[in-house]
């Protein structure tokens, strides 16, 4: 096995050129085998194998630096830098991360997880290099999906002023999570499909390479490259920005990639290398279903089907269903996603109401202000977005939506702990950052029925409103009773004495388990479904304080600025002597791992909460 000869960074340079294709095949087989067991980002990594090999062959790590945008396509990089054994624990608690981690390897120079950050980070590292008088090579690898994000263009605009070398590799597979949209995607597609140019370039190069005067002719052709490209490739967008453009290059030809990276290293200034790859290359199911294999659960290699198929609906499914019903009933309801129609559950809405569906690309800031404009124009926009990604648009929520009290609905998926994707994706801050904004209403459903009811309430609410719900199976609840959603009011599920459990959203299920344990231990226990985190139901809080020895708040959110803080402030204002125990996540980033395991480790499970309450009593 060629892969057995690679134990650390730079060992790949021992591999003979004629073995590059065989090594790429071994890497793909390794990734398919391991990810079929652990789950992970398969499609993007299969598409980036040769590109990663070429970078490692053309550079010297860790002196040279590679910044991976988003970072989910860094598995081959990890494999080539001595982390082969880590794949057994990929995305497991205390195991190897699915993203680059500085603490994991000195070859990971910058932590990533969100989109469109690599060019800014790389530019900063270039400036640091120059100020320190160093000569190493800095490379940022960014996908065409990430290039739909505005931050990437802010950085490109800045990078165009560089006078020292900085390489930006555009890994163009015409996909982000779902298929790319927008003007830049159309532009890149025109470049990508300019086969006349690509074939001409490669054909001329190969024909001249073996002749006596071939190298001198090639050099002259290269000096004329800008003029030729202007004739063949429409727009020359990057060149017009002041960034040297090289490509398009076949992203699955290691030798061609090494040549172009070598050429890029000689450029004085910023240079963009346009590499065309295929997401999922080498594995037929991933090529047929690229969105499904973006982030795959463990699967059967032969069929590509999940090993543990889901038999129940999840919260995203529930949201998808209610949005389609709302679209039918309310002609002014429109839906917005930031490049994730599949992940957010809006694909069905898109198919049913294409004129009222908007995929804005990986552009959360634009998505929110675009929604504000729709609301100002008389529509009822629903922005469906993951909790960890919505935090990128905080200023737009505050300045463009809430300041004007515009009726924008934020459907916040993946709120709370999300598990295997780790620190960059845990949705544990939204209650805090949304509750800090004047005029924002924040709701959290206890189960799938309440999610539907809250969405129906939200689209008729005259102001900004957020509904946050977790990843995973949609809890049906212990009872099908559905108390009407009344603005600012909580729901008393049980009312007794001694202990009052005030649970937010997904924590209601855990609170029911805690209550059972307390009852078995002889304690009278009330249970409140908070429903509205903001505005907090102060009448309910005062009632709980008057009738109980201990109030326990429960939320999947960090402590600072969360619901527990709001209850503490209310009790202080009322000069209440009732004791308060807040069950929250710690003031820390939460690593990757199984969600239930993380809850136990962080004392958010029923047993841990029960034991702590026993201590208070």
What role is predicted for each listed range?
Residues 1-80, 239, 243-245, 250-258, ...:
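N-terminal amphipathic, basic-rich helices that act as targeting or association modules
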Residues 39-48, 68-72, 100-119, 142-146, ...:
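Active-site nucleophile and cofactor-binding loops and adjacent substrate-binding regions
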Residues 3, 174-319:
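Long, well-ordered, tryptophan-enriched scaffold segments
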Residues 298, 302, 306-309, 419-421, ...:
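Peripheral docking tails and interdomain loops at the edges
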Residues 41-162, 315, 332-333, 337-338, ...:
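Cofactor-binding active-site loop characterized by glycine-rich and histidine/acidic residues
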Residues 65, 269, 277-390, 396-406, ...:
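Non-catalytic terminal/interface segments that mediate subunit docking, oligomerization
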Residues 259-262, 294-295, 304, 314-329, ...:
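Glycine-/acidic-rich phosphate or pyrophosphate-binding loops and their flanking alpha/beta elements
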Residues 217-285, 407-412, 431-480, 606-617:
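Structural signature of the thiamine diphosphate
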């Amino acid at each position: 096995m060629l892969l057995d000869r690679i134990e650390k960074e730079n060992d790949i340079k021992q591999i003979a050129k004629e073995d590059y294709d065989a090594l790429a095949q071994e890497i793909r087989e390794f990734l398919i085998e391991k990810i079929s067991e652990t789950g992970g980002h398969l499609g993007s990594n299969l598409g980036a194998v040769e590109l990663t090999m070429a970078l490692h062959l053309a550079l010297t790590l860790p002196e040279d630096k590679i910044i991976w945008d988003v970072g989910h396509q860094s598995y081959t990089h990890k494999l080539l830098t001595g982390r082969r054994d880590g794949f057994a624990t990929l995305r497991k608690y205390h195991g190897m991360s699915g993203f680059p981690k500085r603490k994991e390897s000195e070859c990971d120079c910058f932590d990533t997880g969100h989109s469109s950050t690599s060019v800014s980070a790389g530019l900063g590292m270039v400036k640091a290099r120059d100020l320190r008088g160093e000569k190493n090579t800095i490379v940022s690898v960014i996908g065409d999906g990430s290039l739909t994000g505005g931050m990437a263009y802010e950085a490109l605009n800045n990078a165009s002023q560089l006078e020292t070398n900085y390489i930006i590799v555009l890994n163009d597979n015409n996909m982000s999570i779902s298929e790319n949209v927008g003007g830049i995607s159309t532009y890149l597609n025109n470049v990508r499909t300019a086969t006349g140019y690509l074939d001409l370039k490669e054909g001329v190069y190969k024909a001249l390479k073996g002749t006596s005067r071939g190298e001198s002719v090639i050099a002259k052709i290269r000096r004329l490259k800008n003029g030729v490209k202007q004739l063949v490739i429409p727009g020359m967008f990057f060149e017009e920005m002041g960034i040297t453009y090289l490509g398009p290059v076949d992203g699955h030809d290691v030798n061609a990639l090494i040549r172009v990276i070598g050429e890029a290293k000689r450029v004085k200034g910023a240079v963009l290398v346009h590499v065309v790859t295929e997401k999922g290359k080498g594995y037929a199911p991933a090529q047929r279903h690229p969105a499904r294999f973006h982030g795959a659960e463990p699967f059967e290699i032969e069929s590509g089907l999940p090993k543990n198929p889901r038999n129940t609906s999840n919260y995203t499914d529930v949201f998808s269903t209610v949005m389609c019903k709302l679209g039918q009933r309310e002609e002014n309801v429109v839906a917005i996603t930031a490049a994730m129609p599949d992940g957010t559950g809006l694909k069905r809405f898109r198919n049913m109401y294409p004129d009222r569906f908007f995929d804005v690309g990986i552009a959360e800031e634009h998505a929110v202000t675009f929604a504000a404009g729709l609301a100002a124009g008389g529509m009822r926009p629903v922005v469906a977005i993951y909790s960890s990604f919505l935090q990128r648009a905080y200023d737009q929520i505050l300045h463009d939506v809430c300041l004007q009290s515009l009726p924008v609905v934020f459907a916040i998926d993946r709120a709370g702990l999300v598990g295997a994707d780790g620190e960059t994706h845990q949705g544990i801050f939204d209650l805090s950052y949304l509750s800090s904004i004047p005029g924002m209403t924040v709701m959290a459903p206890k189960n799938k029925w309440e999610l539907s009811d809250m969405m129906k309430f939200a689209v008729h609410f005259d102001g900004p409103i957020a509904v946050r719900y977790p990843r995973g199976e949609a809890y049906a609840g212990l009872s099908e009773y559905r108390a009407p959603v009344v603005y600012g009011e909580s729901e008393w599920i049980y009312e007794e004495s001694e202990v009052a459990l005030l649970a937010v959203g997904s924590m209601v299920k855990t609170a029911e388990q805690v209550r059972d344990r307390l009852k078995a231990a002889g304690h009278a226990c009330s249970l409140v479904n908070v429903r509205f985190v903001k505005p907090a139901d102060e009448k309910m809080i005062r009632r709980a304080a008057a009738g109980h020895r201990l109030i326990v708040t429960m939320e999947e959110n960090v402590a600072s600025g969360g619901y527990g803080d709001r209850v503490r402030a209310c009790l202080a204002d009322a000069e209440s002597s009732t004791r308060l125990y807040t069950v929250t996540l710690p003031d820390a980033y939460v690593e990757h791992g199984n969600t239930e395991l993380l809850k136990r480790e962080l004392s958010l499970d029923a047993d841990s909460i029960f034991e702590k309450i026993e201590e208070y009593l």
